[in-house]
A protein has these predicted regions:
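Helix-turn-helix DNA-binding segment
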Residues: 123-163
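Hydrophobic residues on short alpha-helical segments
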Residues: 138-142, 172, 184
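Basic, Lys/Arg-enriched C-terminal extension of HTH/homeodomain DNA-binding domains
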Residues: 173-194
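Residues within the DNA-recognition helix of helix-turn-helix
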Residues: 167-170
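N-terminal regulatory/sensing modules of transcriptional regulators
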Residues: 1-123
């Protein structure tokens, strides 16, 4: 099984390499940037991609480089980790069938799980793409990130204000954040997957 590690921090890449090198069934490659990873994916064709996208969480606009990277990932299982205390979950949160997100402090637990995976193990991929959010939750989240008030979101979606509030609460519970600011930070990355 091929694993691509992407992190600007040399020590993190070296640590992940050292941890996973004990498994003879894994082939590892590491690169410091998303730009280099986009090129490496074409030749290396990884089964799993472990990537630190913290810097991209700070970029609110559209990032063509990140969009290109995400498109190049194909059917690889992608684990995005962030140098933040959130999401508040000890296990990776699945955003889609192939993409999960976690806080960097839980990276050792992920690596422990990956080191036990044999080369014969196939990564499960569903024939139909799924999402963590319902279509209506996704619409509410998009409007919410533009700072639209509840009553306007409700009017646009033809639902009640309390339903909008309920969707917002479900969104923060699903992504394991406490408030809109934490969600907005993560949203700058996962908006490319929907």
């Amino acid at each position: 099984m091929k694993i691509l590690i992407i992190d600007e921090c040399f020590y993190t890449r070296a640590g992940v390499n050292t941890y996973l090198n004990s498994s003879s069934t894994l082939t590892l490659m590491d690169v410091p940037t998303v730009k280099q990873a986009t090129l490496a994916i074409q030749n290396f064709i990884p089964d799993i991609i472990i990537v630190n996208l913290t810097n991209y969480c700070r970029f609110g606009g559209h990032c063509p480089l990140l969009a290109q990277f995400i498109n190049s990932c194909g059917q690889a299982k992608v684990y995005i980790y962030l140098d933040a205390s959130y999401p508040f979950s000890e296990i990776p949160i699945p955003l889609t069938d192939t993409v999960s997100i976690l806080a960097k402090r839980h990276l050792p637990k992920l690596l422990q799980g990956l080191s036990g995976v044999s080369g014969d193990t196939q990564i499960s991929s569903s024939c139909c793409p799924t999402s963590l959010f319902s279509p209506q939750e996704h619409k509410v989240m998009c409007y919410w990130m533009t700072e639209m008030p509840n009553y306007r979101i409700a009017r646009k979606l033809n639902i009640s204000d309390s339903t909008v509030y309920s969707h917002k609460r479900h969104i923060t519970k699903k992504i394991k954040v406490r408030n809109r600011l934490e969600l907005c930070f993560i949203y700058n990355v996962f908006k490319y997957f929907y």
